[in-house]
């Protein structure tokens, strides 16, 4: 069984169809690449898989659980995240403030604290640097953030 499946997804921006029935699967331990020209839909596919966009059709099972109706922040808690190219951090804010920006719409303070601890467990360097300005982090540290 595949760890991740993308089954015949169709994604639109308004009336414009951006993705026309893309399918692929990723087995555990497998690495794949999305290759295509500028504007071919690579980023749209990744945004859809990570919950930033919702397909009009198709399914995206991840470890047996359908992702299409799950909000992006919950997909992250399942262990999948989209790390965009570039280092889009708030340079004048601390690491901790940057992380908290990702939770600004969430109300459950206990859940936010647990999520923050999970991030720090996965990225101990960020915990060490939580009070440091994000703009002063190395490139790799900014990608972690």
Give residue ranges: language-model regions.
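ABC-type ATPase nucleotide-binding domains, specifically the catalytic core motifs of the NBD
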Residues: 14, 70, 95-114, 122-127
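The feature captures the beta-strand-to-loop junction immediately N-terminal to the Walker
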Residues: 35-37
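Helix-to-loop junction immediately C-terminal to a conserved catalytic motif
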Residues: 50
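Conserved ABC transporter NBD signature motif
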Residues: 58-66, 78, 112-116
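Conserved ABC ATPase signature
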Residues: 133-137, 141
């Amino acid at each position: 069984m595949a760890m991740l499946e993308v089954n015949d997804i169709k994604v639109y921006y308004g009336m414009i169809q951006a993705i026309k029935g893309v399918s692929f699967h990723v087995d555990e331990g497998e690495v794949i690449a999305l290759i295509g020209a500028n504007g071919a839909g690579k980023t749209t596919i990744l945004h859809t898989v990570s919950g930033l966009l919702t397909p009009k059709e198709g399914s995206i099972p991840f470890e047996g659980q359908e992702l299409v109706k799950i909000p992006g922040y919950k997909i992250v808690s399942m262990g999948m995240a989209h790390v965009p190219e570039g280092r889009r951090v708030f340079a004048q804010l601390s690491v901790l403030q940057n992380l908290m920006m990702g939770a600004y719409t969430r109300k459950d303070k206990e859940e936010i604290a647990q999520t923050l601890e999970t991030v720090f467990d996965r990225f101990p360097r960020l915990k060490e640097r939580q009070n440091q300005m994000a703009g002063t982090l190395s490139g790799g540290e900014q990608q972690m953030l």
